[in-house]
A protein has these predicted regions:
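Peripheral membrane interaction modules
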Residues: 2-137, 141, 145-147, 154-311, ...
Length: 369
């Protein structure tokens, strides 16, 4: 009807206890502009706190950079830069920019060329490891095609070389850390500060209780040793929890318990839940690495439930590795090298292990029809 205002009955009855025309006192007293100005001031101060070391010789495969320091509350971020040109003008090229943003709790990697930044990378193999007022040690390993970054002895991320490459860098710089130190040498292993790997225990059968000598706590994204390998007719069992926001995880059987030099991977099992996640089954990729990746085996066979407990098995057969998840076979990979070469296990990503052990495969699950 013209001239008549009609209101929603439900809206008329709603009463949220807010008086029209008033703003909460806390918002009146909080000066957002001043807070933003303080943050910009802190960023400017962080850029001015620099420690630069000129390289006596170019970085090469095996170059090892160790940076130590302690983040402080008045500097909201810090960075490790590997670059060339004038390091103080702010216009030099940066081959690798490792930017730790403490308020946001993530680390950005990027490259700057001709004053233009590229695409940021933020993914990592572990949770954010830095805290205010807690000392840190960052290790940087320069490889042929990438740099590897470890924090406090644990591998954190990798960053593929862009243009310009760190192999043509002339300096390394730490910005935003007042007590920073830098040490640049060569190494034949990475990370140098890694704790000794845990040995995977052997049990008599799959439901056998753990021995008192077994590890009680398994770290995510860890490497463990298999001193006697995986004997034929035995299986590697990983029981753990899946991340609620399941993205992906990988399990590798390798010929050495190390991150670098890159070990041979006899079997690589990668569950990629993020690829077309609307489909009823997750993508499983199987492969092997002997200096380069071989031919992939790809199939949609996993039906994992995020946030739940799961049991993952890799069984050594007569001529193949068989992979099971929760009593269902999700893939097979033929031997691409002698299986006796397996001496280590590595798991990464969204599978958090609680029990890991070897046992005979006599009670293996059956193939799902």
């Amino acid at each position: 009807m013209p001239g008549e205002v009609v209101g929603c009955i439900s809206c008329i009855k709603m009463n949220f206890g807010v008086q029209e025309g008033t703003i909460p006192r806390d918002f009146i007293e909080y000066d957002f502009a001043e807070d933003a100005l303080d943050f910009e001031t802190q960023l400017a101060e962080a850029r001015d706190v620099k420690f630069t070391q000129v390289l006596a010789e170019p970085l090469s495969i095996g170059s090892h950079i160790v940076c130590t320091g302690t983040p402080s509350e008045d500097l909201p971020w810090f960075a490790v830069n590997i670059g060339m040109g004038d390091p103080d003008s702010g216009h030099g090229d940066i081959a690798v920019h490792f930017n730790v943003r403490l308020p946001q709790r993530y680390v950005v990697r990027n490259t700057r060329r001709h004053s233009k930044w590229g695409t940021e990378e933020t993914t990592a193999f572990r949770l954010f490891p830095f805290k205010m007022d807690r000392p840190f040690t960052i290790e940087v390993l320069v490889d042929e095609k990438q740099t590897l970054w470890a924090v406090d002895g644990e591998h954190y991320c990798s960053y593929a070389h862009r243009q310009p490459s760190p192999h043509v860098a002339t300096w390394v710089q730490v910005a935003g850390v007042r007590n920073a130190t830098l040490n640049i040498n060569k190494t034949d292993i990475y990370p140098t500060m890694a704790p000794p790997p845990i040995e995977v225990p052997l049990r008599a059968f799959i439901d056998a209780p753990p021995e008192p000598s077994e590890p009680t706590c398994w770290r995510a994204n860890a490497i463990a040793t298999l001193s006697n390998g995986v004997p034929e007719g035995h299986q590697l069992v990983i029981h753990g929890r899946l991340r609620p926001m399941l993205h992906s995880f990988a399990v590798d059987l390798m010929d050495g318990a190390r991150e670098w030099p890159a070990p041979n991977v006899h079997v690589h099992v990668n569950v990629r839940a993020h690829v077309e996640p609307h489909l009823p089954r997750q993508l499983v990729v199987l492969n092997a690495w002997y200096g380069a990746w071989g031919l992939e085996r790809r199939q949609r066979t996993a039906r994992l439930v995020p946030g739940t407990q799961t049991t993952f098995r890799i069984i050594r057969g007569a001529g193949e590795w068989s992979v099971y998840a929760d009593d269902s076979m999700i893939g097979e990979l033929e031997f691409r090298a002698a299986p006796e070469g397996v001496k280590a296990l590595r798991f990464r990503g969204d599978l958090y292990p609680e029990q890991v052990y070897l046992c005979p495969a006599t009670n293996s699950p059956v193939r799902e029809e």
